[in-house]
Regions:
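Glycine-rich phosphate-binding P-loop
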Residues: 1-13
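Short, well-ordered alpha-helix to beta-strand connector turns
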Residues: 17, 64-65, 110-111
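A glycine- and Lys/Arg-enriched "phosphate-lid" helix/loop adjacent to the NTP-binding pocket
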Residues: 83-154, 166-175, 198-202
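C-terminal accessory "lid"/substrate-recognition subdomains
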Residues: 151-239
């Protein structure tokens, strides 16, 4: 199962990997049904129900299913952390700490998280509708939080977000539709299976250089990260 953090990427992904499908219902449908406020106006009830909805959706599938989710519990906890820091809602530290173990456990049921970071040369286009808050300051602050979680994935052996020995790969994906697919091909074979978990060959040195090229081209700087060479975090020797 794969999670991605931008809806447009999902459409491009499924066009290239037709084995994959998306759940019929998303957390956005639940928000509408319950009339919840969200994003900058989110509350404990909203965040708690979104988190449980996301986890329940993950539980409907097995490792044999080809499913791609638009957002995952990592996105949910980032919004909760943001709201807690702003102190403008009922979300507090106690609530965030209550959610963290659920988020961490839920990560065991994902194979890959494709993360679409915002960079100066690879900006993410957002649709201005009632489903998303497109306030640029808010979007940038959430992006910074997600990048911090990604850095935690890269460097922290004792992460609060991920179980080190049982966690999904977390991969930056950026650029135009074709470039996004080229990056995904470094981690998924033609059938959409994770490379290294089937009989598919491991990522080659040439492919690693290609990935570094894309990261350089789009201003992704992570000289300290080891995720590229160890996307599943199998090397327990670093923190």
């Amino acid at each position: 199962m794969v999670s991605q953090s931008r809806s447009k990427v999902i459409k491009d992904f499924i066009e290239y990997y037709p084995k994959y499908s998306t759940p019929e219902k998303t957390y956005r449908d639940m928000i509408k049904e319950k009339g919840y406020t969200h994003s900058q106006q989110t509350t404990k009830d909203t965040q708690w129900d979104i988190l449980n909805f996301m986890i329940d959706e993950q539980m409907k599938y097995t490792r044999e299913d080809y499913v791609i989710f638009d957002r995952c519990p990592i996105d949910n906890i980032a919004y909760s952390i943001w709201a807690c820091a702003k102190q403008e809602s009922d979300i507090d530290t106690e609530f965030v700490e209550k959610c963290m173990p659920l988020v961490k456990e839920s990560m065991k049921f994902l194979d890959i998280i494709f993360f679409t970071p915002i960079t100066k040369v690879a900006k993410v286009e957002l649709e201005d509708n009632d489903e998303r808050d497109v306030d640029p300051v808010f979007v940038e602050e959430i992006d910074h939080l997600l990048k911090a979680i990604k850095k935690d994935w890269d460097q922290n052996h004792d992460s609060k977000f991920f179980e080190h020995d049982d966690r999904p790969a977390m991969i930056d994906i950026f650029g135009n539709p074709n470039e996004r697919i080229q990056i995904s091909k470094l981690y998924l074979d033609a059938d959409g299976d994770c490379i290294g978990e089937t009989d598919s060959p491991l990522v080659t040195e040439e492919e690693l250089r290609e990935m570094e090229y894309y990261k350089y081209k789009f201003g992704i700087s992570d000289d300290k990260t080891k995720a590229l060479n160890d996307p599943k975090g199998l090397d327990g020797g670093y923190k």
